[in-house]
């Protein structure tokens, strides 16, 4: 991961999976005996950890399961703090059978507030535009309801476009809560609710428009390239997609001096 980031011109990585495992907490690299060594390795290589991704969702109709997800999120927050990462990512996510949208929204808001209130210093919880709350308005509404300054947003541009947002519209909505950005090109697939990640310029997510909006927001965080090979084995290998993204972004930039940082993501 670190060597790929260096090779392809990324300044940071977003931790999601390692050696095929999505359970970062079970990895020996992040265990107490090896954690300091792992942190030092990233620092020595000059690669920042910009976010620790969880699989946590807060949509369950069972209060006990939501409480369990809060517990898991907080465990990831402790890991992030020890690694010097400023964020953890959580999902909203899907309205469950028999549940209503408004009550699901309220459950999610309650859970992210509960996480935020117990976060270690220097780490925020960031809700991704994802699932049934992928539109900027839907995700931002949850952040407003949570009403906790440590609750932020991850703007997944492709997800919000797939949910019907324009990039300009979404940017206006997320700007006050924005902590992190996921960017990839993608296109709809017949018979699937999920858009397929594609190489830059082959889908419906305009990098040019995204960069223009990001500049207007005066955003100074990471733009994290998300390549979902783990879930979509048919797409190109990371060795193809990682340099394709950085080349596409850099070709669009007229003035690199105010460029947001580009981050590889382990997806």
Please annotate each region the language model reported.
Residues 1-11, 136-267:
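Histidine-acidic metal/acid-base catalytic patches
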Residues 2, 6, 35-37, 41-51, ...:
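Active-site acidic/histidine proton-transfer and metal-coordination neighborhood
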Residues 10, 15, 47, 80, ...:
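A structural motif
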Residues 10-29:
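N-terminal substrate-binding region of glycoside hydrolase catalytic domains
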Residues 14, 51-53, 89, 126, ...:
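Conserved beta-strand positions in the central sheet of alpha/beta enzyme cores
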Residues 16-18, 54-57, 93-95, 128-132, ...:
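Active-site beta-loop-alpha junctions enriched in small/polar residues
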Residues 21-25, 58-63, 94-100, 162-164, ...:
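A short acidic, helix-capping loop that chelates divalent metal ions and anchors anionic groups
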Residues 24-29, 66, 195-200:
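Short glycine-enriched, charge-decorated loop/helix-capping segments at active-site entrances
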């Amino acid at each position: 991961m670190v060597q790929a980031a260096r090779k392809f011109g990324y300044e940071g990585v977003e931790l999601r999976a390692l050696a095929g495992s999505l359970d970062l907490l079970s990895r020996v690299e992040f265990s107490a005996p090896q954690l300091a060594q792992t942190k030092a390795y990233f620092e020595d290589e000059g690669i920042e950890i910009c976010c620790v991704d969880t699989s946590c969702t807060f949509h369950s109709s069972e209060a006990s399961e939501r409480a369990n997800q809060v517990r898991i999120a907080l465990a990831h927050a402790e890991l992030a703090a020890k690694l010097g990462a400023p964020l953890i990512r959580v999902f909203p996510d899907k309205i469950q059978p028999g549940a209503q949208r408004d009550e699901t929204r309220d459950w999610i808001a309650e859970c992210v507030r509960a996480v935020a209130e117990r976060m270690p210093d220097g780490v925020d919880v960031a809700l991704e535009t994802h699932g049934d709350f992928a539109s900027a308005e839907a995700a931002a509404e949850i952040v407003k309801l949570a009403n906790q300054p440590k609750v932020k947003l991850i703007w997944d541009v492709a997800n919000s476009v797939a949910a019907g947002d324009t990039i300009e519209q979404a940017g206006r909505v997320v700007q006050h809560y924005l902590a992190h950005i996921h960017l990839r090109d993608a296109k709809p697939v017949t018979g699937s609710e999920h858009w397929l990640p594609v190489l830059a310029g082959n889908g419906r997510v305009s990098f040019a428009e995204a960069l223009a909006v990001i500049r207007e927001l005066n955003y100074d965080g990471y733009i994290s390239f998300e390549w979902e090979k783990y879930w979509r084995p048919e797409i190109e290998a990371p060795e193809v997609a990682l340099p394709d993204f950085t080349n596409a972004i850099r070709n669009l930039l007229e003035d690199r001096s105010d460029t947001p940082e580009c981050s590889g993501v382990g997806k």
